[in-house]
C-alpha cells in the first residue's frame, strides 16, 4: 500500500519538475510521468489569476518537497482499505489501471474534475488534501454524537436507521461499533490539519503549520477545490476494527462513510439505496472481524473471499424481510453499477473480485434470504459464513 501512494506521488512530482523518472515507476503499472497523461487529465486551462497564485505558491515550497509523501506512516496506510482508491487514481490519471473508465460513476467524477488542471491535481496530492479527510475520520472522529452524514446532513436519517437495523440483524456484539462521516470540510480546520500532518507525515509543528497554511490559501484561492467539499477528497468508505493509537488513545470499532462516495451514487440516480448498501457491506466486515474470517493470509484470493462475502452479507440484509426489506430489482440495479466502479487489478492483494463475481456473490445473498424455508428467519453469522464458503468456488468461477 505504501508503494502505491509513493509511486502515485512520485509520478506527479516528476511531471511537476519536468524530469525524466519513467524508468523508476513504469514497473509499478503506473502512468508514465508526463504532464500530458500523469495529471493533466483534461484540456482545461488555468485562469490567469489562479495560475498566478499557483506560481507564487510554488516559490514557497521547501527544498525537500519532492520526498514528502515517502514519509507517510506505513502502519497507518495499512489501516485503511483502499476500496475506492483505484477509481480515484484512475480518474486523476495518477496511475494506469486495466479498469473500465467509462462507468457511470467515473463519468460523473470526470465531469466534477473537468476544470482540474495538472497544477491543481499536483497541489491536492502534495499537500495531503487527498488523504487528510480519510485519516482524520479514521483516527480522530471517535464519537457518533452530533454527527451528520453528507455535506448538508442529507444522508443522516438513512445512515442512522440502517446502522440500527444492521445491529439488530446480525448476531454479533455491535453496541461498540460507531459510524462516522468523512467530510472534506475538515481541511478548513487549521488545528485538525496540523495534527493530521504531524501524525501522517511525521512533520515538526512548524512544518505542519506551513502545510496547513498552504492548504488554507489553496482553499481560499482555488475554486476547483470547492473549499474542501469536492467529492474526490471523500470518495471512500471503510470498516476498521479497534486498535490502540498512542498517545491519542484507542480508536474504536468503526465504519467511515465519505460524503463523496454517497454523492456520486446519488448524482447518477441511486440515492435511495446507495448509502444503505454501502453501509451494509462495511458492516459485513465487522461481522467478519468478530468471526475471525480474515486470518493472517495476505493474497488476492484471501481478499477476494472476504470482499465477496461482504457483498453477499450486504445483499442478504438488504433483501431480507427482517433486514432492510428492499425490492431486489432495485437493489440489483444499484449493485450492477456499484460493482463496476473499476476494481480490476487482479494481482493486487486488495482485489475485490470481478464485477461478475461480485454480482454472483450478491445474488447468493439474495437467494439465501428469498429461499429461506421460514421467511423472516435470520441465519446466524456462523451459518451464513459456512454457506457462503461452500458456494465460493461456484461464485468465483463466474
Q: Where in the sequence are the language-model features?
A:
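Extracytoplasmic/secreted envelope proteins and their assembly/folding machinery
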Residues: 160-167, 254, 280, 284, ...
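Short pre-active-site segment immediately N-terminal to the catalytic Zn-binding motif
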Residues: 261-277, 297-301
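Long, well-structured alpha-helical subdomains associated
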Residues: 25-28, 319-398
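Bacterial Sec-dependent N-terminal signal peptides
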Residues: 1-5, 15-48
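A metal-dependent hydrolase signature that marks the N-terminal structural subdomain at the beginning
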Residues: 32, 40-230
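Post-HExxH zinc-binding segment in Zn-dependent metallohydrolases
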Residues: 300-327
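Catalytic Zn2+-binding segment of zinc metalloproteases
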Residues: 282-298, 317-322
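Extracellular/periplasmic catalytic domains that process cell-envelope and extracellular macromolecules
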Residues: 247-251
